[in-house]
């Protein structure tokens, strides 16, 4: 994708958002009627029964005639950009890595423990499931809206308010007193919106700041920050709750991490210009596409 890469990424990732909306309600029904063991087994069957067949039947490399003209014309010419080693020597690579890690630690554990937080505030299981469905809806909105804005404006400016707003969610969730349903929904929506935005952001910025030459490798290493931080975050939230008896300390730390992660992105600077593949470099008579990025 060249012209609207941000929106394309957002649309591609909406499947996880739909799952996040539907699965809390489905899981609650399964637990209530069949128990948690059956619920786990049913969830395990979903990727085998739905995702795997879809991938085997329809996920493939496009044929030459199906490719966009600018890609088909380029043939085997190397794409512009950095190699993984070159990217890792740039400070902005580690700035982006740190930003991803901070924001992921902040929201990933909150997502896992949000039903527990709501239960401690007097929410029934069905009410907590409804709030989690709103979380999924906001991920959907975050991916589409952020993807569209990334194509129009400088990414760090787009994401600064989006990643700072979940700090308000952390403040809302502090304490152990009664919590209004609409307030809980607001907290879940803001955090979910940021979650959707960040997923778009990693894929988008990997291409804009380091080019497409080694995009897969660079994106993979950047995504390690997401995967490792998500694993640490859920355990960290649980450890704080079990040790101190409250989620408040980790929620305060998460609010700081949201803001710090957003501010770090401002240090990335303008997008590099990797140049465009010329007609001579392509060895083709096809003129280069001036709108290709």
Please state what every model-predicted region is.
Residues 1, 9, 197-210:
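Intracellular juxtamembrane helix-capping segments at the cytosolic ends
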Residues 16-63:
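Helix-loop-helix hairpin linking two adjacent transmembrane segments in secondary transporters
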Residues 52-58, 255-283:
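Multi-pass alpha-helical transporter architecture, strongest
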Residues 20, 209-244:
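A late C-terminal transmembrane helix in Major Facilitator Superfamily
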Residues 85-148, 233, 237:
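Extracytoplasmic gate region of multi-pass secondary transporters
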Residues 107, 127, 133-139, 145-148, ...:
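C-terminal transmembrane helical hairpin of 12-TM major facilitator-type secondary transporters
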């Amino acid at each position: 994708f060249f012209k609207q890469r941000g929106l394309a990424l957002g649309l591609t990732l909406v499947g996880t958002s739909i799952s996040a909306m539907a699965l809390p309600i489905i899981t609650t029904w399964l637990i209530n009627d069949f128990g948690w063991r059956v619920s786990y087994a049913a969830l395990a069957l979903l990727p085998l029964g739905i995702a795997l067949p879809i991938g085997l039947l329809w996920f493939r490399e496009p044929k030459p005639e199906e490719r966009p003209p600018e890609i088909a014309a380029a043939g085997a010419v190397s794409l512009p950009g950095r190699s993984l080693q070159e990217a890792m020597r740039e400070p902005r690579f580690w700035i982006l890595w740190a930003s991803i890690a901070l924001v992921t630690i902040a929201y990933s554990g909150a997502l896992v423990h949000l039903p527990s937080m709501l239960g401690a505030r007097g929410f029934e299981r069905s009410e907590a499931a409804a709030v989690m469905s709103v979380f999924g809806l906001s991920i959907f909105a975050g991916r589409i809206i952020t993807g569209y804005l990334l194509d129009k404006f400088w990414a760090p400016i787009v994401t600064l308010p989006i990643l700072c707003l979940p700090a308000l969610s952390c403040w809302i969730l502090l304490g152990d007193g009664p919590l209004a349903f609409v307030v809980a929904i607001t907290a879940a929506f803001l955090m979910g919106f940021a979650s959707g935005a960040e997923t778009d952001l990693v894929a988008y910025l990997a291409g804009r700041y380091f080019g497409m030459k080694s995009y897969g490798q660079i994106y993979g290493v950047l995504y390690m920050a997401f995967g490792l931080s998500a694993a640490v975050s859920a355990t960290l939230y649980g450890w704080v709750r079990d040790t101190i008896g409250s989620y408040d300390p980790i929620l305060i730390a998460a609010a700081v991490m949201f803001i710090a992660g957003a501010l770090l992105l401002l240090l990335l600077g303008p997008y590099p210009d990797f140049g465009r593949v010329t007609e001579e470099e392509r060895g083709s008579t096809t003129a280069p596409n001036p709108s290709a990025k």
